Amino acid sequence: MSFPTDMETNEILDQLDKIDERNEDILLKSLKASKCTYKPWSREEFLRRLLTYRSRWAYVNDPQIGEINCCLNGWLCESNNILVCDVCRNKINLTALQQVDAENDSLNELPEKTKERLEVSLKEEHQDNCLWRLHKFPPDIYHLSVSAELVQVGRRFNSLSTRLVSTHLPEEMTLKRLEKVANKIRVDWEKEDAAVLLGIALTGWSEQVPGRLYVCNYCHRRLGVWNLQSEGQDFDVLEEHKKSCPWVIPQPFTDLLGWQQIFELLCKESIFQSTTKTMDVSQYTDYTFSLLQGLR
């Protein structure tokens, strides 16, 4: 196993930082300039807007003013402490919180009433006639598109390179089940490290830099292989997602996590205990694949 040198690692990071900064600036400008940015029904639009927070927002982990809640209320991230609405053009400036955050180590130390007021401001700081004030994204917009992900698993697998780091998969992903999935989605089971690469694809990870950098297109989490190598850690395909990522939280109409739902559908068997009534798995997958295979 070859480890990247410090120079190679720094070069990759510098390039990615420049690309991210440029791409997020372009995305922000594009969203602000668009004539039709109000699409509270669109999951694709929500994920695109969420991307503006990836390397900027200072309060990612706070449930009340974190990136998910801000994005649900129609705000784009302009900088570490500033939100902007692309419809009414109003802004929310939280620069004053930086000092409070520094003194308390965490926003969790803020008085609950203060946090509640901040959360309310996500709605009230829009202008009175702003569409985002009248109707925000529905809370369940941030979940997996099941039909799309059933197809994307195979595409992610085909694009993955040979792994360069030890990988930890869920224990339910046995070789027998993974081979079953490989046959179902018609990918090369003889490919080197096929079982592990399929497990990576089944949990939502794609490659941004071949063999070096993985990315999730839902929570926009990026993981550098060199970080794991230098610390002697495994790539835990579930733990590395953000805690709010649809791949690792219960999905609508079921208490199964995102990856569990996709895995069960592809295996065509009941693997995980579910307390809610779910659809007929075999009927759903047969119909979905007969429809989607024709689009390949």
UniProtKB/Swiss-Prot annotation:
Residue span of the signal peptide, if any?
Answer: none
Q: Which InterPro entries match?
A: NuBaID_C, NuBaID_N
What start-end ranges are recorded for coiled-coil regions in this protein?
none
The segments annotated as C3HC-type zinc fingers are 40-174
What's in the keyword line of the UniProt record? Cytoplasm, Metal-binding, mRNA transport, Nucleus, RNA-binding, Transport, Zinc, Zinc-finger
User: Does the record's keyword annotation contain Metal-binding?
Assistant: yes
Entry keyword Iron: no
One Pfam family assigned to this protein is NuBaID_C
Name of this chain's protein:
mRNA export factor rsm1
**Source organism of the structure:** Schizosaccharomyces pombe (strain 972 / ATCC 24843)
